[in-house]
UniProtKB/Swiss-Prot annotation:
Residues the record lists as binding heme: C437
Stretches in topological domain Cytoplasmic: 23-495
InterPro entries, sorted: Cyt_P450, Cyt_P450_CS, Cyt_P450_E_grp-I, Cyt_P450_sf
Keyword terms, alphabetized: Endoplasmic reticulum, Heme, Iron, Membrane, Metal-binding, Monooxygenase, NADP, Oxidoreductase, Transmembrane, Transmembrane helix
Entry's localization field: Endoplasmic reticulum membrane
Entry comment describing in which tissues the protein is expressed: Expression is more abundant in the rhizome.
Gene Ontology biological process terms from the UniProt entry: diterpenoid biosynthetic process
Name of the protein in question: Ferruginol synthase
Family per record: Belongs to the cytochrome P450 family.
Gene field: CYP76AH1
Amino acid sequence: MDSFPLLAALFFIAATITFLSFRRRRNLPPGPFPYPIVGNMLQLGANPHQVFAKLSKRYGPLMSIHLGSLYTVIVSSPEMAKEILHRHGQVFSGRTIAQAVHACDHDKISMGFLPVASEWRDMRKICKEQMFSNQSMEASQGLRRQKLQQLLDHVQKCSDSGRAVDIREAAFITTLNLMSATLFSSQATEFDSKATMEFKEIIEGVATIVGVPNFADYFPILRPFDPQGVKRRADVFFGKLLAKIEGYLNERLESKRANPNAPKKDDFLEIVVDIIQANEFKLKTHHFTHLMLDLFVGGSDTNTTSIEWAMSELVMNPDKMARLKAELKSVAGDEKIVDESAMPKLPYLQAVIKEVMRIHPPGPLLLPRKAESDQEVNGYLIPKGTQILINAYAIGRDPSIWTDPETFDPERFLDNKIDFKGQDYELLPFGSGRRVCPGMPLATRILHMATATLVHNFDWKLEDDSTAAADHAGELFGVAVRRAVPLRIIPIVKS
């Protein structure tokens, strides 16, 4: 307790010096007045992506925000996003790293946070050319088909008993099963099981601790003290998940040593084992276990959120639901599971998913970037060390880009070639440039196929339609922005 006055004094001095030094700069992007010490933090509210979108209408597409002592520039237009992510992509390739990400040295090992150097390039090459190649995705689609059948069986049981389906819960378990099948040829969880809840606790523990507001991220002087216990809790959850992944990998390595001529499996783990045994890259086993942690946590949270929003929008817009059902019926017929190879024949399904990503980007501010050197953008100075947040939410709802941006209208994409693969800066749910999400090929397959399975096989009605509009409008900010109220809808077998 005796050290507290000294700590408080140092904290105040550091924050004041930082504040005054930034006030002296005359060529920063405009923004709201920052108060000493706290900056603009008191203005953010529960949904900062919405607040930033409103403020950008006043201050412009490049906006200065002070989050404590962390100077941040908010990017809110496709033109400025292209400047940051493409034209000056090398300068803005750094990462602002939250304290929680230091757990188990994840910040030093994960491809998502490694500097753009040799290790990062090797990991990127493996992801692009081997793990997420078209050949790899096609080889593992049979595994995913089995897990979609389990989703179908679960919903059928709910329909038979007249129970509502918690779409978030069903989407979460299905996403974990689809990912564990693709990564490990195994089933991570089952519906309504104890193992499900244990695995869910670990995954959500990691996602929650990474997304929780942490004073030490905004005031780095506090990091050694970990005042909220974020780092300590992150070490626990990261450690549990890494232990599970390492168990899968060690089991496969041992199996390959014992029986080197055994038939190969069509999962990612087989690719990883081959790479490790070939010793082709200067990478260690932990690079791959941390990559799989990123895939599990990022993929489960974003896909779960997007599937729930897709079903929420379709239930609230029955004419769009009917059109999608008709398209699925015309292509899949009486087949219960729509084949992944049928995707090019399903333009309306693709349009629905694009529209969901436009209105509800799962990570509305994307992963933070950091300026590696001073850089001028659009006539403004962005100093070295600045955190960069791309407001995909604001871009997706900008009326100068989209007609009736608050309206769910998949038809807007039927004659529009805009895609979310990183080349069109109007739609950036997976980012763009050298830091684009490496798991996008798997994530998009999961999202399209899970949504198609739910829509194709059942009609749906709300469990309680008295609060439907308010529930649909509410958002809960985190690593991914969820519905504030979980979507519960009753499945009805189509007659």
